[in-house]
């Protein structure tokens, strides 16, 4: 159930966050409106799957939940703040006129930062958490490493690719053509990052190799 919840979250909220990451590539306000309208009916429900994964982890493995939360409380807290900030920007952008550009920046920032932090959390988990007798004994910033930053960038690119694919399916004309042009670049970047992470992981974590 935990894995299923996380997987569904990555797929569903991935393209959702990807829309915000792709915003800087689209300058036309009407096209940006179209981008947001494609996810407006579903965006606020996608985070439910992340809650399901967290609740499932707490219910099934409370010790693991406590350890992970102790080790990663800072990036998790910042991620939640970014998601809230993004949600506020999503709602207020539709009602703003003179300040729409500011809410666009907030939407871009919230989406990108939340995605990046999710990747850093993944990277920190892959690298391993220092524990003794089920208690986290590492430092507050052990999660902040070059490897976790690289996985953070990887998740940002992956979500951008998911968002690009979503827009290819849901839009047409000029916006769709722009997404078709952007998709190969995102796929190449994602492949390079995936290859680098795959090569570095066994090197940094012999137990995984």
Map each language-model feature to its residues.
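Membrane-helix interfacial "entry" motifs
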Residues: 30-33, 37, 63-70, 100, ...
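Membrane-embedded alpha-helical segments in integral membrane proteins
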Residues: 1-4, 52-64, 193-203
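Alpha-helical transmembrane segments
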Residues: 1-9, 67-81, 108-112, 142-157
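Long, contiguous internal "core" modules enriched in hydrophobic/ aromatic residues
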Residues: 92-209
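N-terminal signal-anchor module of multipass membrane proteins
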Residues: 1-45, 51-54
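Membrane-water interface of transmembrane alpha-helices
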Residues: 12-21, 78-91, 157-167
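Membrane-interface helix-loop-helix modules in multi-pass inner-membrane proteins
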Residues: 42-111, 132, 207-208
